[in-house]
Structures are given as C-alpha cells and as structure tokens.
Amino acid sequence: VSTFADFRTQAQAAGARTILVNDMLSGSGTVAISADKAIRGVGANSGISGTTLGIEDMHPANVIIQSMNIRGVPGRGAIQIESATHIWIDHNTLSSTIEDNPDYYDGMLDITHAADYITVSWNVIRNHWKTSLVGHSDGNGSEDRGHLRVTYHHNWFDHTFERSPRVRFGETVHVFNNYYSDVDNNADSYAIASLMNAGLLVEGNVFERVRQACWSASGYADSDPGRLVARDNSLISSGPCEVNGTVAPIPYTYTAEAVGTVKSSVTAGAGAGKL
C-alpha cells in the first residue's frame, strides 16, 4: 500500500493478509488492526505517523508489525495493545521528540487489559518519555493477574525517560539482551520498573548512562513494589538495578546472548530495514 486510506482499509479488513507499506504514510485517528495481519515496511524508510495502531479484543490476534518507522502521536499512544494475545512487534524504529511536557505524547508501546503472549524484539525506541507500559492501573489487578506475559529482547532504548518497561501485575515479564543508552534525561529517569507484585527477569542487558536501571523493592510513584530477579547485566555509568524476591520460571527455551556482545549486536541489528 502507498496511501494511508489503503493501509487503513487493508489493516481493518477481515481475513489473513500481509500488508507491505511503501513510504511514510501520514494519517490520523486510530487504525483498528484486525486479526491475522502481518504489516511490514518496505526498505528502511517506510512506516506510519500521526495515527494510533490499535490491536484490541482479539484472542488470538496473530498480528505482526515489522520493519516500520512509527512516530509518536501527540496526546495519544502510538501502538496500543489491549485485551489481545499473540502479537510480535519486531525490527521497528519508534521515535518521537523530547518535549518538556511529559504528557505531550502518551505511550509509545502500551500493553494493557490482560494482553498476553507478546514479543517485542529488535526495535529501536528513541526520544520518548512514556515508553512502554505493561498494565495501566494499580487498581486493575483482578483482570491483569495471570496475564501480561511479555518478552522484550534485543531492543535499543535510547534517550527514553522511563517505562522501558514499567510493569504492573504481569509475570513473568522477560527483559533480556536489550541495550539502554542515555536514559538520564532528568532526576526521575529510569529504565525498568516492576510494580504491584509483577514478576520480572532482567538478564544480559547493557545499561549505559542510565540514571536508575531498575526499580522493584522500593515501588515507584504511588505503585507498590514488584518482584525482580537480575542476572548477568552490565551497568556502565549507571544507577543500580534494584532486585526483590523471586519470579516464576520462563515458560519457553531460549539462549541469552553473552552480555559482552549485546551492545554491538543491538546497535547493528535493531530497527526498521534490518531484517
């Protein structure tokens, strides 16, 4: 597709299809992506701006968003996953502009309302305040407990203020082999937060010039503490990764990359156009 109107039509249509996006398409409002869609950018410079990509109320969704440039949307979220399962967000470049007002943009990639089985891999997320929220409210535990199982791996979080991710209730959220750089935009900047008894495994990540790598036992803002296990991380000119308690085992097999090669792997391989 090469127009926003065609993109919206194809993304919202019923049935399985692969949608190839040519060029940067500018739109507005929300595109409600329907089930069984693979959305891929062509080359390194294709994508979407000005609109929210909504993936909601589908079990399973079976949605892939890959190799897209996605811009922050003033006053709105960029990608909103809500009450949906089986979604892969891979090799995208998600970026905004650093603004003085933290509410100028909403979330870049928010996962809420008991969404489940989500993988976020090999993305560049840059220049954003409210990066990625998992679980939207301290009061939503009855819906969220036992869900919000999300994996983040081989992403580059660059100049993000916070929420990379911020997790309530989800277990186990697996955050491994990501590179965090210059997460030090103000005195409250942090990378990861485990809250409201969430359970996170944080392993093999590189934190470079990060004000606070992780919050857990202390809670954050008005949210109660969560649990966090950290292992084999590298902290370079960064604040600590606070740990607390134990978490449930990861329910899949995987091989974590040695932390010594994570920065070079991620900076070379993450982002749109690098499939």
Language model region names:
Residues 36-42, 61-72, 85-99, 115-136, ...:
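Right-handed parallel beta-helix
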